[in-house]
Amino acid sequence: MKISKEFQNGFLIFLGIAIYFLLMNLLGLSDVFYLRLFNTLFVLYGVNRSIMMNIHDGEVFLVNNAKSAMKTSLIGVFLSIIGLIVFSYLQGGDQYVQSLSKTFLFGGNPSVMTYSICLLFEGIASTVVVTMLLLLYWNNRLVTD
């Protein structure tokens, strides 16, 4: 059974984000908000890799590449959120999330699920932004007259 390129690249996004956050946690930098923004690089890499694989396979239609890019990014986001939920409960559940949320845009004391749902919406929004940016980039590269 062949695994789809979207799942392969979505899993690469998940692995990159997971290793990055585990490394930040081990180094004691998990509370530095600005370092968390670098996870966008892993999403950009995975989505760009899917689009490049499509182009290599001869798929140059914008809509098909958009679907592939969105699937790739959403798989990475969903796997990352599931990993965050598991990791949060292993680290103490709500108490761990409350230590993270001190530097995040939450009011009050969010639970693991509240935190995860908010990050899910943020991830879906970033999926749309990353997909559109890369599609515009590749569309300009592939235009032939």
Regions found by a protein language model. Name each.
Residues Y96-T114:
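Short, membrane-exposed interhelical loops at transmembrane-helix boundaries
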